């Protein structure tokens, strides 16, 4: 009779788990998940934990639709949801089709899990709870870091894999997005897995196999079901495959695109109700929506008129300096592979022109090129091209490993110092907590330098964090009315109040700052989105006096104002001497 080998007879398995390219990324990803989970609270929903970013503009839309997809529609219709009449009833009345369903479904699943296990305090009557869905983004971010680390480690060595996973975690903009119930982090996960699957499965022979084309096509469909940015994947992978395999790539590309489109259509029931009409409606939204304004180089610009260099400048300026430098090195230098056998591989991972390296670099460049094209709308900092950052983390891991190997050959101490300096970039995560979406690298002078350059310092109302709301409660008498500006959509202020136990306990009413000439509120809360927020001079001229300012790295991101009275006299500089200024720690 055959006996199963004991664990001691399988050193290879344990070596792979504990000492191979998997262990480091697992530890890094779990540490990131733990840190993010501790810092999700926007408004005193988890009073015993550190604060997280404030409720951002789009989160409540995503959570509401996620809860609809996971809880409301299945509860009302069950399996009868597949009935065409029920589909029409469910997906025409309450459903918001501004984005495909998969990302919101992901958030809805984790909303259900958290609400079942550990519902937050003070929001028992809310139809959905944003902070609970935020955990879904935290998990997606950890999985993205893990995928990047394992992929890089298996091809370029353990050091490169660990550095790649860590590079992603140490990007404050991505770390901040991982705290939000938004679609960007889930999109990053599906985009990254699709690119890495193509790089892994399509480079194993003389041409991509049909099976590999089907598998990556399924992932393409999942990406298309998450967010519009996935439309970049077919041209990216198509050009890459044709460049390396010429005519041999035509068949797998046809399979890849066909499967992706089938999965996309099959996974979105809303399309079934009026396929051509709804498909056109979805893809035309980017050109038919209302215009937004962007603050760039000291000017307020319409999103369609932003200069071509905006994505490049924002991408470069929002990366930590050493990760930027390591990524450049990883993009332009030859590198060693994991082992001699890998170096003999037909695709030679370490060579600059190898299929793997070119696809990773292409995944970075494609979003930047798209949003640099004339007439393509771009706004909200790096949010729309956040998919460019995971590929850069891989390049940074490769670049760091190159330097590390050279230093190790000369001086072990120098390699250790390099590692410590690289890890020290985590300082950005602490210094910008909880306003990670306002991070700028030291190579542009940090946030203060970016403000001096005329770059946008905040844009998504995350600066209305727990500390700022607590200041409102401290200053405003019970039952006061606080007006909010700028107002980017009608439900912004109602959802801020609904998701805030702090404001509800103090019976603070919240409303839009709709009439600057005749304000009806007692106080005014401003998040400093420069392109849309009223200027300080205008507020002073309307009779408002600053009460508190919330700053990060010396730059005001949110402020609280009240109507002028005898207790708040302006000095010649146009400010009040009793204004409190709070610096986030």
Predicted ranges, named:
Residues 20-59, 67, 74-76, 86-89, ...:
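Transmembrane signal-anchor helices characteristic of membrane glycosylation enzymes that use polyprenol
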Residues 38-52, 103, 269-273, 278-286, ...:
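Catalytic lumenal/periplasmic loop and adjoining terminal transmembrane helix
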Residues 131, 135-156, 193, 197, ...:
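Transmembrane-helix motifs of polytopic, lipid-linked glycan transferases
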Residues 1-43, 143-146, 153, 250-262, ...:
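Start-transfer (signal-anchor) and selected internal transmembrane alpha helices
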Residues 23, 28-30, 117-124, 146-170, ...:
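Transmembrane-helix signature of polytopic, membrane-embedded enzymes
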């Amino acid at each position: 009779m055959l006996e199963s080998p004991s664990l001691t007879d399988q050193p290879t398995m344990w070596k792979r788990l504990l000492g191979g390219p998997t262990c480091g990324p697992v530890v890094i990803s779990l540490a990131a998940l733990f840190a993010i989970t501790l810092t999700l609270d926007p408004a005193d929903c988890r009073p015993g934990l550190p604060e997280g970013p404030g409720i951002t503009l789009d989160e409540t839309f995503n959570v509401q639709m996620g809860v609809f997809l996971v809880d409301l529609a299945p509860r009302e219709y069950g399996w009868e949801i597949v009935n065409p009449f029920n589909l029409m009833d469910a997906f025409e009345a309450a459903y918001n089709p501004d984005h495909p369903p998969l990302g919101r479904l992901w958030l809805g699943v984790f909303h259900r899990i958290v609400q079942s296990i550990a519902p937050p305090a003070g929001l028992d009557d809310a139809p959905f709870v944003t902070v609970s869905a935020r955990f879904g983004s935290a998990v997606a971010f950890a999985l993205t870091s893990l995928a990047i680390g394992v992929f890089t480690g298996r091809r370029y060595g353990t050091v490169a894999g660990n550095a790649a996973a860590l590079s992603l975690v140490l990007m404050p903009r991505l770390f901040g997005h991982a705290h939000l119930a938004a679609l960007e982090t889930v999109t990053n996960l599906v985009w990254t897995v699709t690119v890495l699957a193509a790089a892994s499965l399509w480079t194993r022979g003389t041409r991509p196999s049909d099976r590999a084309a089907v598998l990556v096509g399924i992932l393409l469909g999942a990406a298309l079901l998450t967010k519009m940015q996935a439309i970049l994947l077919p041209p990216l992978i198509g050009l890459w495959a044709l460049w390396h395999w010429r005519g041999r790539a035509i068949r797998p590309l046809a399979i890849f695109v066909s499967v992706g489109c089938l999965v996309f259509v099959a996974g979105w029931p809303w399309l079934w109700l009026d396929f051509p009409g709804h498909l056109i409606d979805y893809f035309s939204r980017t050109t038919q929506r209302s215009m937004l304004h962007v603050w760039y180089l000291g000017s307020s610009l319409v999103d369609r008129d932003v200069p071509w260099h905006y994505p490049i400048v924002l991408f470069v300026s929002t990366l930590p300096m050493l990760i930027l430098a390591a990524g450049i090195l990883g993009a332009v230098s030859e590198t060693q592979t994991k082992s001699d056998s890998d170096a003999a591989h037909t695709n030679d991972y370490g060579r600059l022109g190898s299929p793997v390296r070119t696809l990773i670099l292409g995944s970075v460049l494609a979003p930047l090129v798209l949003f640099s094209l004339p007439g393509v709308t771009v706004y909200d900092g790096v949010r729309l091209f956040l998919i460019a950052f995971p590929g850069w983390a891989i390049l940074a891991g490769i670049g760091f490993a190159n330097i590390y190997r050279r230093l190790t050959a000369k001086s072990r101490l120098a390699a250790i110092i390099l590692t410590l300096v690289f890890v020290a970039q985590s300082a950005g995560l602490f210094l910008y907590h909880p306003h990670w979406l306002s991070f700028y690298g030291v190579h542009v002078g940090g946030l203060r330098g970016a403000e001096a350059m005329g770059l946008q310092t905040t844009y998504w109302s995350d600066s209305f964090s727990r500390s700022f709301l607590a200041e409102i409660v401290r200053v405003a008498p019970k039952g006061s009315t606080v007006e909010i500006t700028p107002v980017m959509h009608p439900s912004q202020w109602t959802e801020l109040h609904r998701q805030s136990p702090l404001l509800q306990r103090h019976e603070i009413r919240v409303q839009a700052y709709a009439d600057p000439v005749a304000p009806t509120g007692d106080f005014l809360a401003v998040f400093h989105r420069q392109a849309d927020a009223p200027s300080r001079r205008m507020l002073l001229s309307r009779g408002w006096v600053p009460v508190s300012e919330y700053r990060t790295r010396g730059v005001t991101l949110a402020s609280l104002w009240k109507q002028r009275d005898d207790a708040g006299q302006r000095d010649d500089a146009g400010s009040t001497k009793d204004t409190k200024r709070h610096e986030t720690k």
